[in-house]
């Protein structure tokens, strides 16, 4: 990439390492992605939990928050108001790589016609299996997110063959419902 892209990556890594040291998450990375809403100059870092600065401005947005929805569901045909989605590939506290997808006018301006950004998913699929349920919050796909964020009332039936992610989606749905409806459920 360009010198600006290299500087941006270095800045991201330095900030993430400093914050991770403060939060002590063990081997799990706090931040796994970022979305840039179109035309606003804003950036939202998406992570396992929400973190705010002293002024209560979000530093990391919880993956279950409504503002994080485009991270999982934006497509080339329906960018959901974002111009960039960025996946961070990490191992523990080490940033291994950054995978960008650009949408809308930004994609046209960069001359990019090809949809990119499947690197994080492919890496997760190719990772060795341990027999334990994996941590997939960074690689939830749009169809899975629709099930996870489905309205609460009524019965929700999730069907699929062995190994298609039914249990993982159900567990993330439970986490989403507890996050979104925590006060009515108390």
What do these predicted ranges mean?
Residues 91, 124-186:
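P-loop NTPase Walker
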Residues 1-123:
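N-terminal accessory nucleic-acid engagement/regulatory domains that precede
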């Amino acid at each position: 990439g360009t010198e600006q892209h290299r500087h941006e990556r270095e800045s991201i890594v330095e900030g993430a390492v400093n914050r991770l040291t403060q939060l002590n998450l063990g081997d799990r990375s706090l931040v796994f992605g970022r979305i840039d809403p179109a035309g606003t100059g804003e950036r939202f870092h998406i992570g396992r939990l929400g973190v705010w600065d002293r002024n209560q401005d979000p530093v990391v947005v919880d993956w279950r928050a409504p503002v994080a929805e485009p991270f999982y569901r934006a497509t080339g045909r329906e960018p959901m108001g974002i111009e960039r989605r960025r996946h961070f590939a990490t191992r523990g506290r080490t940033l291994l790589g950054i995978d960008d997808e650009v949408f809308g006018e930004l994609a046209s301006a960069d001359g990019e016609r090809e949809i990119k950004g499947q690197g994080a998913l492919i890496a997760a699929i190719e990772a060795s299996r341990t027999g334990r349920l994996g941590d997939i919050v960074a690689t939830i796909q749009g169809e899975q997110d629709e099930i996870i964020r489905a309205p609460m009332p009524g019965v929700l039936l999730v069907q699929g063959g062995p190994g298609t992610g039914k249990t993982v989606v159900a567990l993330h749905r439970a986490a989403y419902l507890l996050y979104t409806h925590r006060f009515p459920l108390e």
